[in-house]
């Protein structure tokens, strides 16, 4: 069997030696034994990493449940609420408005071909409040806030500030992680409402002001398509999205590698992991909510006929 080579990323951690030696160390002979060993080690590392993260989540939840007075201490929570929520409003509002405009712009011709352009607003607003708004707001929070949290906590780890807190009998989990996780959990649903509102207004602007659809028809069909179930489902999911962003970002910061490169890698990894958590949770929670609604309302009225 002819041997090739495959890339071994773990050697990229080594920073000593010449660059040519590092590149040579990253090329490992490819055969069945090495391939099985490599992929097996990656699986083991992934399982161990998930176990460490689950332990991190359990400790955070224990701190919140067992020490609610410390967890909701306004002096620690208020700055995080401001950083996560207030400072994220512009980017969430702008992206939400433009998403609504784009959906109206792309969907109008298809609906007009069917003679149903007056119902375009209902379809767009249902999609925005149920799926697009919560996911969009969560992704913006993950990009703007999650990376910053991971970088901040990673810098504290690299500069040994976390060890100093432990030496002074302070709990980094209670003082640093809990306020940030709570802030993300509380503010993400609020930002989702901003995203929903601006998305609906953006779609209205294009549909009514540009394409000339009747304004009363736009809002009438919005009321027909969007019941209490859609906004409730979107806000319900956004709570889990925010908690996932806070937990993942803090975990990546607490476990970053030494050096400036480690902090940058932690920030990048926090966004990637947060985005994956958002889309996975969105699928799971969407199926859960659909099943719950079908159980509560076996026969739902249709507005498509």
Question: What function would you assign to each model-found segment?
Answer:
Residues 71, 80-136:
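Active-site cofactor/substrate anionic-group-binding motifs, chiefly glycine-
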Residues 120-163, 191, 248:
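Hydrophobic alpha-helical transmembrane segments of multi-pass membrane transport proteins
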Residues 80, 160, 171-192, 266, ...:
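Start (N-cap) of specific transmembrane helices in multi-pass transporter permeases
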Residues 28-77, 252-257:
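Short, membrane-interfacial amphipathic segments enriched in basic
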Residues 153-178, 259-263:
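Short cytoplasmic-facing helical segments at TM-TM junctions of multi-pass membrane proteins
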Residues 189-193, 197, 227-243, 271-284:
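Hydrophobic transmembrane alpha-helical segments of multi-pass transport and channel proteins
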Residues 95-98, 138, 142, 178-207, ...:
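Hydrophobic alpha-helical transmembrane segments that constitute the membrane-spanning cores
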Residues 106-129, 197-239, 248-269, 289-305:
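Membrane-interfacial helix-loop-helix connectors in multipass membrane proteins
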